[in-house]
C-alpha cells in the first residue's frame, strides 16, 4: 500500500516521481502498477483503468498491472470485466488472497453466487479472520445451497469484528438477510431488533410486524404495528397534496399498518377470539378511519 504513515505529502511526492517515470516510459510495468495503485487508493478508479489499459495494449500478462486493472473494474462495479481480469490472473498462477477475495466479490456483484462462494471460501481459508471475507462469504452462501453456512459465517464475523456502529449495522443487516434465506424467522426478528437499536429506522419495526403477521402471530404483529405507528411523525403519516389534503390513491405504511391491525381484529372477532369490547378505535384519528376502509 502506497498511502502509509508517511502522510499525504509523501504520497504526493511518490506520485510525482512515478508520474515523471511514467511519462518517460509508459510501458514500464512496475511504474504503471504503482501509479495505478495510487489511483485506486485515492478512489480514482477510471484513471487506474486508463493507465493500465494503455499498458495492456502491448502486454496482457503482467500480474501486478492486471491486479490493479481488475481491482479498478471491481470498484467501478463493472463486475463482468473484473471477473474476466481476475480469472485471467488465476490462469497466470495468481491465487493470492486479494485476487481470490476480489474475484469472489466480483462474482457476487455479477449475481453468480456459486462462483462467489468458491473463491471467497478459498480466500477465507487463507485468512479466516478477515471480516470482509466472512461478510461476503456469508451473503454468497445464503444465496446458494449452503444457507446454514451463511448464518455461521456471519455469526463468526460478529465474533471477531471491531464493534464500531457502522460495522455492526452492516453485519446485522447481513445477518437478517442470511436468516431470511435460511427461513429462520425467529432469529431474523432477533437480528432486526438489534438492527433497530443501531439505526432507529422505524421501517424495521414495520418489517418485524409483517414477519409476525406472515407467521400468523397476531398478538406480536399488532404489537409491532403499533410500535411502528408510534414512531411515525404526524406529518409523515398520510400522503398529502401541497394544500395539506389527503391524496386518495396513495396509502402510506402508517395507514397500511392501521388497516392490518383493523383486519386482524376483525378476523379474530368473527372467529370468536376477540370480544367486541377489546376492539379499539384509533384516538379520533379520522384520517386513518377515512383511509382504512
List each language-model region with its residue ranges:
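Canonical positions in the second alpha-helix
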Residues: 20-21, 54-55, 88-89, 122-123, ...
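Short coil turns that delineate tetratricopeptide repeat
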Residues: 26, 60, 94, 128, ...
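Terminal, low-structured helical/coil segments at or just beyond the last alpha-helical repeat
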Residues: 181, 214, 222-293
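Canonical tetratricopeptide repeat
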Residues: 34-37, 68-71, 102-105, 136, ...
Amino acid at each position: 500500500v502506497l498511502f502509509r504513515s508517511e502522510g499525504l505529502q509523501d504520497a504526493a511526492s511518490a506520485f510525482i516521481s512515478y508520474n515523471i517515470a511514467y511519462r518517460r516510459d509508459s510501458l514500464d510495468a512496475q511504474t504503471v502498477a504503482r501509479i495505478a495503485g495510487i489511483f485506486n487508493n485515492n478512489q480514482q478508479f477510471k484513471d487506474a483503468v486508463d493507465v493500465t489499459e494503455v499498458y495492456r495494449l502491448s502486454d496482457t500478462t503482467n500480474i501486478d498491472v492486471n491486479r490493479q486493472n481488475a481491482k479498478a473494474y471491481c470498484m467501478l462495479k463493472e463486475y463482468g470485466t473484473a471477473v474476466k481480469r481476475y480469472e485471467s490472473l488465476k490462469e497466470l498462477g495468481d491465487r493470492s488472497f486479494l485476487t481470490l477475495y476480489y474475484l469472489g466479490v466480483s462474482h457476487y456483484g455479477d449475481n453468480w453466487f456459486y462462483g462467489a462462494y468458491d473463491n471467497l471460501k478459498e480466500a477465507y481459508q487463507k485468512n479466516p479472520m478477515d471480516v470482509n471475507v466472512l461478510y461476503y462469504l456469508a451473503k454468497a452462501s445464503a444465496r446458494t445451497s449452503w444457507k446454514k453456512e451463511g448464518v455461521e459465517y456471519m455469526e463468526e464475523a460478529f465474533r471477531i469484528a471491531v464493534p464500531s456502529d457502522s460495522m455492526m449495522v452492516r453485519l446485522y443487516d447481513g445477518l437478517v438477510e442470511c436468516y431470511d434465506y435460511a427461513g429462520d424467522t425467529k432469529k431474523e426478528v432477533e437480528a432486526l431488533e438489534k438492527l433497530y437499536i443501531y439505526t432507529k429506522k422505524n421501517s424495521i419495526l414495520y418489517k418485524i410486524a409483517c414477519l409476525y403477521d406472515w407467521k400468523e402471530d397476531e398478538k406480536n404483529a399488532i404489537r409491532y404495528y403499533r410500535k411502528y405507528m408510534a414512531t411515525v411523525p404526524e406529518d409523515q403519516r398520510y400522503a398529502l397534496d401541497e394544500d395539506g389534503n389527503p391524496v386518495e390513491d396513495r396509502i402510506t405504511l402508517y395507514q397500511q399498518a392501521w388497516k392490518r391491525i383493523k383486519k386482524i381484529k376483525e378476523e379474530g372477532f368473527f372467529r370468536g377470539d376477540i370480544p367486541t369490547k377489546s376492539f379499539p378505535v384509533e384516538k379520533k384519528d379520522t384520517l386513518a378511519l377515512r383511509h382504512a376502509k
